[in-house]
A protein has these predicted regions:
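Active-site C-terminal subdomain of aminotransferase-like
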Residues: 1-88, 101
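A common structural junction motif
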Residues: 36, 111-116
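Beta-strand->loop->alpha-helix junctions that form or flank phosphate-binding loops
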Residues: 40, 117-122
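Conserved PLP-binding catalytic core of the aspartate aminotransferase-like
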Residues: 64-73, 78-113, 121-123, 127-131
Length: 132
């Protein structure tokens, strides 16, 4: 069984997918509560997701650039004293701890033309507010 999201991996599309044998997919369609109480992904988003996969498959130079840019940003933020949650993805959670601080920082960065979102409880555990 392979599952994935179109929301985070493919530039803000919506929905997700499960790939498996026909038997398992049929079982999930009939038993999975989230599937039973949701709508199918619209064809336009399926097309956008397929195109994003197509572009990503042929964009090794862009992936390499993204990886290098992510490493550079991580290094710069850490050198400036920020704590960055570790991980292999280009999403860099800047750990701030305080929810009010995360909100203020997100607002200030937006005023400077940098779009980040502040996350705090209940989205993340108490004391682990962050921006990303």
């Amino acid at each position: 069984i392979i599952t994935g999201t179109l929301g985070k991996t493919l530039g803000g599309a919506s929905g997700g997918f499960t790939a498996s044998s026909a038997e398992i997919v049929d079982w999930l369609r009939n038993r999975s509560r989230p599937y039973l109480f949701s709508n199918s992904v619209p064809p336009s988003l399926v097309a956008a997701g397929m195109k994003a996969f197509e572009l990503a498959a042929g964009a090794s130079d862009l992936r390499a650039t993204l990886k290098a840019n992510t490493a550079r940003l991580r290094g710069g933020l850490e050198a400036a004293g920020f704590t960055i949650k570790p991980g292999p993805t280009p999403i860099l959670p800047v750990m701030l701890g305080d929810a009010a601080l995360a909100t203020r920082m997100a607002d200030e960065l937006l005023a400077r033309g940098i779009y980040v979102i502040g996350f705090s409880y209940p989205v993340v555990p108490h004391g682990q507010a962050r921006i990303r």
